[in-house]
Amino acid sequence: MLTYDLTKTDGPLYKCLYECIKNDISQGKLSSGEKMPSKRTLAKNLGVSTITVENAYDQLIGEGYMFARPKKGYFIADVSDIRVIKAPVHKELSIKLPPEQDESIFDFSSNRTDSGNFPFSIWAKLMRETISLREQELLSVSPCGGVRELREAIASHLSSFRGMNVDPDQIIVGAGTEYLYGLLVKLLGTDKVYCVEDPGYKKISQIYECNNAKCLPVQMDEQGISVELIKKANAQIAHISPTHHFPTGITMPVNRRYELLAWANESSDRYIIEDDYDSEFRMNGHPIPPILSIDACEKVIYINTFSKSLTSTIRISYMVLPEHLANEFYRRLSFYSCTVSTFEQYTLARFISEGYFEKHINRMRLHYGRKRQSVLSSIKDCFPEKECRVIENDSGLHFIIQFDTNLPDKTVEELLLKKGIKLQAITHFNLSKPKEDRHQFIINYSNIDADRIVDELLIIKDTIL
């Protein structure tokens, strides 16, 4: 008769009994075809309830260690193919995780937004109301392109803010632009050559390459990406950020925009991916119209995100597809689920449609404008003109500062990091072979502490000049 000590377990008795019997089967102590005691007999022998034995037997039968024969009882199954592998009590895993953000570092390179200005009370109010009013919709599966209400709100916002006349059905919502880039590769094909701006975000080319697409960096001139070099690369897809390029800050003039459209119109398989990231924060004058607004031949795919205008952790982005590509998307890729929760989609839809988003943008534009001037004033106070030069543009939340130093860019970065300051050179964003040091560094001011800026600038001055 089977005998086990079940008194040393902290969990349910049936689990302990199940483990004991399973171990005996795995180690060959109970042979294939051997008959097991009845539930009542084993329960009486172990001093437990019949239901405890029944639950243990059911678990073993469910996993294939035992089987039952009507009116004959329970038997051990043939588990001879199972290899007994003893798991170590403790094992040190060698998984190397990326380093976490060091919050003590004064980071001039971070593109995070100023979290202190997020409208928490309004967002919480809208989310509570959404949960109260939309119980059924919240628990329903979202359409693959996003809920209708959010797509309509985005279309209305694009019409009033960017002068774009788009149908809500052209809009595809996703959790972050990285996800949308991956969808675009699947939609446009891996047989195309994708070109990206150089210098630029390395992540964009990494995403294309991870999706098995050929991606080539194309050099920029003072007007943006070079159309002549796009032609030499034999590219079909041009991924650009014409409104405010990162990191150079270049705003593409209208003649270059028409030149790009002319290139795209030369072949049916050519498209422009217009990344309008950071376009909301133009400090002077009216926002520059996107290329899509002057596209008459459906050659532009427009992409934008709410991670800069609201907060970095709101992973809601969207793209606007030409009509024929929207049809192709729904025909071939509609099996993809929308990656944004319905809770966030309905809340953001109301945040936009009820005017809160426009008010927030206006308030943040004023806030960042003042912060920009404060940072520029601090730089002017800390550095004579001969020691540094600010290269700025009227839009976006960063500018470039050029130091008169003999130190290599890499050395500057390393020395300052040792003193708790993170500063990134423009050469850090070169996608092709690095050029000679330019001593130009990015000042991303959206999330820096303005009260500490003077102290940090003086440390920079003492370290590299």
Residue ranges with predicted function:
Residues 1-128, 139, 324, 334-341, ...:
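N-terminal basic, amphipathic alpha-helical segments
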Residues 79, 187, 207, 284, ...:
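Residue-level signal for well-ordered alpha-helical positions
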Residues 113, 243-245, 308:
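Short glycine-rich anion-binding loops that position phosphate/pyrophosphate groups of nucleotides
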Residues 127, 137-269, 280, 286-294, ...:
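Conserved core of the PLP fold type I
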Residues 154, 198-207, 260, 271, ...:
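A generic "structured core" feature
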Residues 270, 300, 387-388, 421:
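Short, conserved active-site loop motifs that form the nucleotide-linked donor/cofactor pocket
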Residues 275-276:
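Walker B catalytic acidic pair
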Residues 296-366:
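Conserved core segment of the aminotransferase class I/II
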